[in-house]
Curated annotation (Swiss-Prot):
EC number of the protein: 1.-.-.-
A Pfam cross-reference name: FAD_binding_3
Catalytic reaction(s) noted: (2E,6E,10E)-geranylgeranyl-triacetate lactone + AH2 + O2 = (S)-(2E,6E,10E)-epoxygeranylgeranyl-triacetate lactone + A + H2O
Organism taxonomic ancestry: Eukaryota, Fungi, Dikarya, Ascomycota, Pezizomycotina
Broad EC category: oxidoreductase
Keywords attached to this entry: FAD, Flavoprotein, Membrane, Monooxygenase, Oxidoreductase, Signal, Transmembrane, Transmembrane helix
Full protein name: FAD-dependent monooxygenase spyC
Organism: Aspergillus fumigatus (strain ATCC MYA-4609 / CBS 101355 / FGSC A1100 / Af293)
One of the protein's GO biological processes: secondary metabolite biosynthetic process
Residue ranges of the TM segments: 444-464
Recorded GO CC terms: membrane
Length: 475
């Protein structure tokens, strides 16, 4: 009797999510292949990523976090700067480091991708220049993926780790609409929106920005984030409020000329310690100008297809959570696959019902986990761009005087994170994982918002009276 072939996962996208998933599957002994549409696994696009303790813990379980540490200057200080010249400094990054035993890390995205690729046990399982054109159901337990060059790949599960412009997501919707109408609400398929855009890049020779000290410079309708790293390099973001809210399909596209015009317009914006945006721009090595899509999809799977990472939860970069949520997605999915396959007699096959149950539970758990992170990201990008009077007051007159509110809020997000439950945890894990109890993060905003609302009502009343008397205007 011929042995049944092993369970196989087709990963579409050689992204942080996709390559982390490949590592997790490898550790679990589950077969996979990665299809990446680009010609190179780690192109230089000027992008950088933050690895927070919950993402770092999973990478450490995989034996990879040392590669991150080799590339970074750990963050220990956070500065905030406001248009009226007010500055605020905290040690929140250092506090988080001490609570969780892992630093807040910032590095080039391409270096992270290269590290993930180079350390795979068998890099021949990652194929480049393989743009997916279709995903089809073949027989009861197999899916067929076809690429632009006509190649065909078969597996038991297709995972879309192909980013915000996901082809797998589109194929999942197409198949579901034709075979199971109503599974995906029509409004959700067009709900992703764009209100912000971002010019991001890497610069060198900005000596006044010190390694390990991140800066958030608040401004009206825009904000700046800078992360000085090793060897004098600075990773930076200029986040811009657009003129209106656009749907995903109708959002404007930007060229290098558009970026040059914005850079000239905002050249005199002060960032920190005598550094203006012109100083970053004139020493740039590489940059890009992109839209910042925002949306959290509710339905992540259909039959033997599931999407993870930015294809399901796209956030702005202000909180640094995008890559970490993608890493968590990968770990959470493999935890469930590993358990399910171990429970089968042959360890190699899962019925359609098994898959549906597994993916449904994964979807529910990850949606609950990501929801507050996504909402926090939406709030922070608008807070730092001072989008309205309430957020101006909150950022300038309330939060700087709330002690460790930033570190505490981050800690309650980090602590409940999922890790690989079939691998040992690192020995350097610190007390914060237990101190900030899992399951409590969903109550975080309640005690926070009561004093915020009370404070804002008082200040609004004062501003209204003072404005009527004296015509006071706030920067």
């Amino acid at each position: 009797m011929t042995a049944k072939p092993p369970f196989k996962v087709i990963i579409v996208g050689g992204s942080i999510a996709g390559l982390t998933l490949a590592h997790c599957l490898s550790k679990a002994g589950i077969d996979y292949i990665v299809l990446e549409k680009r010609k190179h696994i780690a192109p230089q696009e000027g992008a950088s990523i933050g690895i927070l303790p919950h993402g770092g813990r999973i990478l450490e379980q995989l034996g990879l976090f040392y590669l991150v540490e080799e590339q970074i200057e750990p963050l220990h200080t956070a500065h905030q700067y406001f248009p009226d010249g007010f500055a605020h400094t905290t040690k929140a990054p250092q506090v988080i480091y001490e609570r969780f035993g892992l630093p807040l890390a910032f590095l080039e995205r391409r270096r992270m991708l290269r590290a993930l690729y180079d350390t795979l046990p068998d890099s021949s399982q990652v194929l480049v220049n393989k743009a997916v054109t279709s995903v089809e159901r073949e027989v009861s337990d197999l899916m067929r993926v076809t690429t632009y060059d006509g190649s065909v790949y078969r597996g038991n599960l297709v995972v879309g780790a192909d980013g915000v412009h996901s082809r797998v997501r589109a194929e999942m919707w197409r198949l579901a609409t034709s075979q199971s109408p109503g599974v995906f609400p029509e409004h959700e398929m067009s709900a992703m929106a764009v209100e912000y855009a971002c010019i991001f890049g890497i610069s060198s020779s900005v000596p006044k920005l010190q390694p390990g000290e991140q800066v958030a410079s608040f401004n009206n309708g825009r904000s700046y984030l800078t992360f000085p790293g090793k060897n004098g390099r600075v990773f930076w973001f200029l986040l811009l409020k657009l003129d209106r809210k656009y749907s995903y399909s109708n959002a404007p596209r930007f060229s290098s000329t558009d970026a040059e015009k914005r850079a000239e317009r905002f050249a005199d914006d002060h960032i920190w310690a005598g550094v203006n945006f012109r100083d970053l721009w004139k020493s740039k090595e590489v940059f890009s100008f992109v839209n910042l899509e925002e949306y959290l999809f509710q339905q992540w799977h259909w039959e033997r297809i599931v999407c993870i990472g930015d294809s399901m939860h796209k956030m702005t970069p202000n909180t640094g959570q995008g890559a970490n949520c993608a890493i968590e997605d990968a770990a959470a999915l493999v935890n469930r696959l590993h358990r399910a396959l171990k429970a089968t007699p042959d360890g190699s096959s899962l019925s359609s019902g098994d898959i549906d149950d597994l993916l449904g539970e994964f979807n529910r758990a990850r949606s609950r986990r990501v929801r507050e992170i996504y909402q926090g990201s939406r709030m922070v990008v608008r807070l730092q761009a001072r989008q309205n009077l309430f957020l101006k007051l909150l950022g300038r007159y309330y939060l700087p005087y709330r002690g460790e509110v930033a570190a505490d809020a981050a800690s309650k997000i980090i602590a409940p994170a999922e890790h690989l439950d079939f691998l040992p945890l690192a020995t350097r894990s610190a007390t914060g994982w237990h101190q900030f109890k899992p399951g409590q993060s969903k109550t975080l905003l309640i005690p926070f918002l009561y004093p915020v609302v009370a404070f804002s009502l008082c200040v609004l009343a004062w501003i209204g009276n003072d404005y009527l008397r004296n015509g006071v205007v706030f920067a």
